[in-house]
Amino acid sequence: MKLTVLVGGVGGARFLLGAQRLLGLGQFATPDDNARHELTAVVNIGDDAWIHGLRICPDLDTCMYTLGGGVDPQRGWGHRDETWHAKEELARYGVQPDWFQLGDRDLATHLVRTQMLRAGYPLAQITTALCDRWQPGATLLPVSNDRCETHVVVTDPTDQQQRAIHFQEWWVRYRAELPTHSFVFIGTETASATTEVTAAIADADVVMLAPSNPVVSIGAILAVPGIRAALRATRAPIIGYSPIIAGKPVRGMADACLSVIGVDTTAEAVGRHYGARAATGVLDYWLVAEGDQAEIDSVTVRSIPLLMSDPEATAQMVRAGLELAGVTV
């Protein structure tokens, strides 16, 4: 089976780990299972930024480190056994920004990526090269080789004027607490999805939307030209998972993002935001948490346990989605 999943960072990486657990891939691989299934992740690049002259791709790296067995288990991002000497030395020099953490081991990834970008390699090819070191057991594809950054229009606290700041500054520095007016996906007017991404969607037996942030992760992927058309054209069933349980995001600040675009923080509202593929949206099936309800025209909804407490629990989420769509592993 070919499974293609649209993902963000920490939550998306954990969802992929559960898919690997179910399919027997990556660190859960067996010789028989490894030949029968393929897992491809279409990864958000809206969080990508230039920091200290280096190109940072947080969601790609989180997926790569998690599936490769090297992620910090407490934070859910960055390197295991990380040290922070470079960050401390930069602070002594007074270098800005001082609110974004880059660990010493993590810097190696960003140095390699930046060198390859400056040598003319596209991001997809660079990601493949980085994955050669980590062996994630899945194909990780940036949604585009082009610049597609999420920026946020806020009220500047210094002069009360509206201005756009990078998503990382809004999310990490200000913790989404500034008066916020809109999200802008910079570069999408000229960007396009890679041919590898559209092929992964077209050739899939099943497509899933991970329970990642519906605005700045999945939403940023959907904003890239070519993605919605590919999803609407694929013959594969499209199964989405709610990131909202009992009116609250499982992690992160999805509620802050949803309020900016006028969507309620409920499983039903997020499902309606994605919409039915039978109309103008992208969903065929929608999984919500036990105790939550959702009615979405032309979308089949089921309630299941949705907490990704460990790979086995997440594997059962993936299995439930496949069963709902009538797909047998």
Curated annotation (Swiss-Prot):
- State the InterPro entries in the record: CofD, CofD-like_dom_sf, FbiA/CofD
Query: Which EC number(s) does UniProt give?
Result: 2.7.8.28
Gene Ontology biological process terms in this record: F420-0 metabolic process
Record keyword Magnesium present: yes
The UniProt record lists the keyword ATP-binding: no
Q: Which keywords fit this entry according to its UniProt record?
A: Magnesium, Transferase
Binding residues for 7,8-didemethyl-8-hydroxy-5-deazariboflavin: 61
**Pathway listed:** Cofactor biosynthesis; coenzyme F420 biosynthesis
> Which Gene Ontology terms cover its molecular function?
LPPG:FO 2-phospho-L-lactate transferase activity; magnesium ion binding
Catalytic activity of the protein: enolpyruvoyl-2-diphospho-5'-guanosine + 7,8-didemethyl-8-hydroxy-5-deazariboflavin = dehydro coenzyme F420-0 + GMP + H(+)
Q: Which cofactor does it need?
A: Mg(2+)
What assembly does the database describe for this protein?
A: Homodimer.
Per the entry, what this protein does is: Catalyzes the transfer of the phosphoenolpyruvate moiety from enoylpyruvoyl-2-diphospho-5'-guanosine (EPPG) to 7,8-didemethyl-8-hydroxy-5-deazariboflavin (FO) with the formation of dehydro coenzyme F420-0 and GMP.
Q: Which family does it belong to?
A: Belongs to the CofD family.
Protein name (record):
Phosphoenolpyruvate transferase
Q: What is the source species?
A: Mycobacterium marinum (strain ATCC BAA-535 / M)
